[in-house]
Amino acid sequence: IAAMGGEAVANGDDVSDWEGAQAMVNQAIETFGDLTGIVSNAGILRDRMLVNMTEAEWDAVIQVHLKGTFAPARWAAAYWRDKAKAGEEVNASIVNTTSVSGIYGNPGQTNYGAAKMGIAAFTIIAAREMQRYGVRVNAVAPGALTRMTEDLGMGQASEEDKALMHPRYIAPIVTWLQSAESSDVTGRV
């Protein structure tokens, strides 16, 4: 990021940890003087058919995906609400990552699909709640080929299809949703 002229700060907190999420948001505000957006993109897989899934596998996926979306958003939302109530202009954005698996389902992913569908609902409701404070909330549902999805059979796709699933096609959408150009877009999945 710095090599490309940007600024960045590392943070090793767990997005699903309440205090860690608060520390993450506070670190961004203290480092950069403000917070204008967050992107929730943490994820894990613990795939198993429903009859074989353990409680720990269910809980781990729900914790990272759903609580890991909620906790940072909650602390950022409180910051933006306080700014708006103080009369300051807020033009902020939350972009969450859901999945086509959460929308259409995928065998062996009841935990993952439930978490991702939960993120979709969270996005729509949070958008309605936060719009009055100048905050947009949207989600992307990529079908990208990553290290995490290679083992799901996506790695078996043709080279042409693999090229189309490259994550580089998702970043411009997320960047646009974080920009002022998308100021009239909220509550979209």
Model region roles, listed by residue range:
Residues 4, 104, 120, 125-135, ...:
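Active-site-adjacent segment of SDR/Rossmann-fold oxidoreductases
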Residues 4-7, 27-40, 46, 89, ...:
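A glycine-rich helix->loop->beta "capping" turn
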Residues 12-23, 55:
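The beta1-alpha1 cofactor-binding region of Rossmann-like NAD(H)/NADP(H)-dependent oxidoreductases
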Residues 49-50, 57-62:
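Substrate-binding pocket helix/loop in short-chain dehydrogenase/reductase
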Residues 73, 115:
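Active-site helix of classical SDR
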Residues 99:
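Residue(s) in the substrate-gating loop at a strand-loop-helix junction
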Residues 139, 159-189:
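C-terminal helical subdomain
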